């Protein structure tokens, strides 16, 4: 099932999702480094990465929602897409709450702030797996004419426009 939100022939959601996943996961890593080294600069940097991750997650959600709405009803893909989407709303909420708790003092986050981010990271592993299931097993966002020798997507877009 082809994506309904594409740029230059590729699904926008798949292009954007690397930003929140990378930024949010790295903010967790920086929490761990800060705890191991007692270096508050890692906590502060993680705080800013977390904020950018939340914002980029909201941006990635828009084309994801567009693609979700195009999935046929009463399919396994629709059910998994729903759990994936709701789960990612929860992930974003957990990280946003952690970010808010850190806002006044990003160099020394509370245990609650670290716990919320850790919970968000754990949930993101599951929702990321669901996203992989949608694409890799169920073909959501995959071009209908995809095959091992398919022409590049830019060439295909020019052929369609002609």
List where the protein language model places each region.
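Short amphipathic, positively biased membrane-proximal segments
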Residues: 1-162
